[in-house]
Design a protein with these regions (language model features):
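Active-site PLP attachment segment
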Residues: 223-259
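Conserved Walker B
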Residues: 209-210
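N-terminal "arm"/small-domain region of PLP-dependent enzymes with the aminotransferase-like
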Residues: 1-68, 80, 84
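Conserved core of the PLP fold type I
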Residues: 55, 61-200, 213-214, 222-230
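Short catalytic/ligand-binding loop motif for oxyanion handling, primarily in non-cytosolic enzymes
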Residues: 37-41, 181-182, 246-247
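Short beta-strand segments
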Residues: 32, 175, 239
Length: 259
């Protein structure tokens, strides 16, 4: 059976990581995968995470199932960090996910199950896995202009012009902050305009939030997201805890639905 499978192409980021590890130069700098490193090149466990693990080790008395949606207490606390009381708790649904990628996948499966999804609009450029997951799920996609390489900023006029072509029941995928790969973010005023366009077009906003706290701070980084979810009827948010909690290998994330 398996002899008929074709070998998958190697991951370019993983190839780059291997090359970096083999490089003997002392002045090398790793600009590959998005992992925090200190001055010594190590990725330490945060003190708060280590303390939490110690408490869990001491007090946890069961490994029994917690239900299909995972730890609701954990998910609600992450929701509080992300949403800052911008929407009524009654409008929120949560599910623990295996990282931000798992949350993204779960929410796209949920949207696909409605059988009413049109195109999913992703920025050009965007995180490569966005396109890969959409293709794997058989969901149609369109792209919108985002980054101006001359000014190194968002070209909002071109972005807005492209998004004017969205149709009812399309999904607009936005980066919550620290846009990957450009680092260029929408201003709060631009979030307001995009929110109005979402309302006018009756499309579903989908926020990929992987870097909260790495831009202008935990609260500032989600101001635009908070405004948006407060002013739309429905939204989806995929949250990654890999970066801001430094728990990359533990695959920690949350899928949030606002309805």
């Amino acid at each position: 059976m398996f002899e008929h499978l074709n070998s998958q192409p190697s991951d370019k980021i993983m190839e780059l990581m291997a090359q970096y590890a083999e490089d003997t130069r002392t002045n090398k700098l790793d600009l590959g995968v998005g992992v925090y490193k200190n001055a010594e090149g190590a990725t330490p466990i945060m003190k708060a995470v280590k303390k939490s693990e110690e408490i869990l080790h001491r007090l946890q008395d069961s490994k029994s199932y917690v239900g299909l949606i995972g730890s609701i207490e954990f998910s609600k606390n992450i929701g509080g960090l992300v949403l800052n009381n911008s929407v009524d708790d009654k409008r929120l649904s949560f599910a623990q996910a295996p990282g931000g990628t798992g949350a993204l996948h779960q929410l796209l499966l949920l949207a696909r199950a409605t059988k009413s999804v049109g195109n999913v609009w992703i920025s050009n450029p965007s995180w490569p896995n966005h396109q890969a997951i959409l293709k794997h799920l058989g969901i149609n996609m369109s792209s919108y202009y985002y980054f101006d390489e001359t000014t190194c900023e968002v070209n909002f006029d071109k972005m807005y012009n492209d998004l004017n072509d969205m149709r009812e029941n399309d999904i607009l995928l936005l980066h919550g902050c620290c846009h990957n790969p450009t680092g260029a973010n929408l201003s709060l005023e631009q979030w307001v305009e995009i929110t109005q366009l979402i309302q006018d077009k009756n499309v579903l906003p989908f926020i990929d939030l992987a870097y909260q706290g790495f831009g202008d701070g935990l609260a500032k980084d989600v101001e635009g997201l908070n405004y948006l979810v407060k002013n739309v009827s429905e939204a989806m948010i995929a949250v990654s805890c890999s970066k801001n909690f430094g728990v990359y290998r533990d695959r920690v994330g949350v899928a949030i639905v606002v309805s």
